[in-house]
Regions:
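N-terminal secretory signal peptides that target proteins for export/translocation
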Residues: 1-5
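Sec-dependent N-terminal signal peptides of Gram-positive bacterial secreted proteins and lipoproteins
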Residues: 6-29
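Mature extracytoplasmic or organellar-lumen-exposed domains after removal of signal/transit peptides
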Residues: 30-278
Length: 278
């Protein structure tokens, strides 16, 4: 089994509860810095970087409206709580992030030349990198517990964004998640889930494309974090479990790319990923 397995499961289970309880208000950082400040800050930076890439993508397609909406996600992620916490370490950087977001906003509204907007986004990215070095101790970046929490927070964000892609009513989300978890538990003797089987959800149409594009962007980040950190703590005897985790993460990408119903993500996250690291 994975090292620190009980810790990883506890952290991911806790974040999953946060996701269920917090469905009524979409705020990925409603619990910012409440449990492990280091891992949450790393997740915050990763999520902003996802939005930066999406802004560039839509600018290249001349879709300033979607670029603006993804910038709004950055503003949402950079909450007052995170800003205040960062200000305690370095007020200049905290202010520069705020100012740069505002500059990008103005340029998108005015439909400034794409290269100029891209340069401002690159500037924001550089400031974020500096914020990591200022905010975190070097030892934290090699801490296995931090890695596990970092991975867990990003999985939680993927879960949340994919839910909101379909805007399923809260009571249906709860029922469908429970049903998906029950179905997964009953099929654990099978080595994998058939993600194309009929699902309890009739809502198969994406209605929130900003959340959907965010979920897509998070998939690649989650895989990178898993392969570069969490996976490195696994012993040779855990190779079979690694294969199952690799398969589950690949299936996450297939579900999102295929725009399958949210219950399919629930099956993978709550039915495979959580149990495999418990």
């Amino acid at each position: 089994m994975l090292k620190s397995k009980s810790k990883i499961f506890l952290y991911i289970f806790t974040l999953a509860i946060f996701s269920i309880v917090g469905n009524t208000i979409f705020n990925p950082f409603a619990h910012s810095f409440s449990s492990d400040e280091t891992s949450l800050f790393l997740s915050f930076v990763d999520e902003i970087k996802v939005q930066e890439k999406l802004i560039k993508k839509f600018l290249s397609e001349n879709d300033y409206d979607k670029a603006q909406k993804h910038l709004s996600r950055i503003s949402q992620l950079y909450s007052d709580e995170i800003r205040d916490e960062l200000s305690e370490r370095n007020e200049r950087i905290a202010n520069e992030i705020t100012d740069t977001i505002s500059v990008i906003d103005d340029k998108i509204i005015q439909k400034t030349a794409k290269d100029e907007i891209t340069n401002s986004i690159d500037n924001l990215d550089a400031i974020l990198e500096e914020s990591v070095s200022v905010r975190l101790e070097a030892a934290a970046l090699t801490n296995s517990t931090v890695h596990a929490l970092h991975f867990a927070q990003l999985v939680n964000s993927l879960d949340s964004n994919y839910k909101h892609s379909f805007t399923i009513p809260n009571f249906l989300r709860s029922n469908e998640t429970s049903k998906a978890m029950h179905d997964s538990a009953n099929s654990q003797h099978k080595e994998s889930l058939k993600i194309n089987e009929p699902t309890v959800s009739n809502n198969k149409t994406i209605s929130d494309f900003i959340s959907y594009e965010t979920a897509k962007g998070l998939i690649s980040v989650i895989k990178v974090i898993y392969n570069s950190t969490v996976k490195q703590d696994v012993t040779e005897t855990d190779s079979l479990e690694l294969d199952k985790m690799d398969d589950a993460l690949n299936r996450l990408g297939l579900v999102v790319d295929s725009k399958l119903p949210y219950t399919e993500i629930a099956k993978l996250i709550h039915g495979i990923i959580h149990p495999k690291i418990s």
